Amino acid sequence: MRIHANCNLPYTVALWGAAIFLAVGCNKKADNTMNFTSAIDTYYGAHPACLWPDPIKFPVQADTSDTSKTSGYDALVDQGLLVRTTAEKKKFIIASKQVNNYDLSDKGRSAWTADVNQPGFGNFCYGHRKVSSIDSSTPTTSATGATTQVAYHYALADAPAWASAAETQTAYPQLHADLAGPQSGQATLTNTNNGWQVSIHPSSGGGQIVE
């Protein structure tokens, strides 16, 4: 009886091993830093940080004697996002007060992020989170529906020029803090049929997020 040795066996085994390694490494469900980073970046790419906690509608009117109401709008006038006009408003039968009327400029309309749920409402958004590091994650599995708590650091990407202006940052302290440097955040990720996705995003002191 002649026995034929399979000289290609080690080579075949090596190929199978490499294929398995690549399949695991490229699997979106794999529990690794790259997939967590991608999930968080994808979520915040569609949920930028904005000036106001709730969408607002222009035009708006503010009493000129109340700088807490006018300073923010005036800073946006300086950046060309709003136009300002003055008027007198009747306060009592024989009295009146000076008010400023603010409305979107052409530049402001192009920078405006409209609210899809409230026609006419919107916000000025100034960037989105870009993960710089995944600091920790709780143990999880590759099963669909599994969750993990992720702690990470990020910086705001794609900030427009108006957001970097000193007047704007003075009028909006949260904007200044967001653009000052790296921030820390936390998120709950859920393993879905399409890979890891953000399911809960606890506040970490960052800017208002458009949902």
Residues covered by each model-derived region:
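Bacterial lipoprotein signal-peptidase II cleavage site
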Residues: N27-N32
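C-terminal motif of bacterial Sec signal peptides marking the signal peptidase cleavage site
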Residues: L22-G25
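Accessory beta->alpha helical hairpin/"wing" motif in late/C-terminal subdomains of nucleic-acid enzymes
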Residues: T85-C125
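Bacterial N-terminal signal peptides that target proteins for export
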Residues: R2-A14
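Basic amphipathic alpha-helical segments that dock to polyanions
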Residues: S68-V83, A87-E88
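Short beta-strand edge/turn micro-motifs at domain boundaries
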Residues: V83, Q149-A161, A177-E211
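Mixed-charge, low-complexity intrinsically disordered segments
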Residues: D106-F121, A159-G181
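Post-signal-peptide N-terminal segment of Sec-exported extracytoplasmic proteins
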Residues: T42-A75
